[in-house]
Amino acid sequence: MTDRENVLFEDNADRFTVSGPEMDSHYGTGAVFHRRGGHFGSIAPIRVPESFFPDNSSVLYTIRPDGVSLISPREKSDGIKYSTEILMGDGASDIMIVHSIKNTSHERKKLSVWSSTALRAGGLEVIPQSFGDTQPMQPNRILALWPGTTLTDPRLFAGERYLTIRQDPEMEKEFILGVNNITGWAAYVLPDTTLIKRYVHDETSCYPNHDCSYRTRVSGCFAELDSFSPIYLVEPGEGIRHVDNLSLFTTRNGVNPVDETSIENFIHNLC
């Protein structure tokens, strides 16, 4: 087995944290959320402080034949309990990550699961455009932009079938974009490895972020590939869950970020 660089982002310098008066008043003085990198799950719509529980305590874990289960302590301020299953059976090519959120409070909550995968610098993100309904009088795509994000950003290429976003270590400004990703996948192409993230988009449900089931956040350090469950009304004692499937492929030739035929052939050869 050869040594390969981790495809996930690692915040070894602890640069990406959330703290301040809102965190202090909600979780206690000195509360800090550390992004750390890698993959994590939380609640959406994304907001401070609720989506940034400083989960710095020990977790309960169970080793299973096909993976591991992780259960965080009950989050007392909001009555939320998080659990994560990381599963990979013998001979499987995918890692399945199941995020579950239970409402342990006495109040109904309106929630979505936020499943975030942060990947290391130097890659190209590929997002399919979702055409959905083709009735000429109805819109069939949603594009959501966050404050500070512009469509003239040089990292973005908007084609007829795909969007591509380059992660550029020289550009610190964050680029954040959401889409109604009906096909339920996105790819991140590194020089020697490609990761594909898959999930199920339910066209009959409503999603956060102006009905976008997918969001990306690209900075000078990483690219974050985020999927979301539908929004649910969660009664006390009930829970919701969301599943991501992550696949890794060894790739050498890369892809032309502005050539949609090249992109389509590249993805087709992987899948």
Where are the model-predicted features located?
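Surface-exposed acidic/polar loop and edge beta-strand patches at domain peripheries
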Residues: 1-96, 104-271
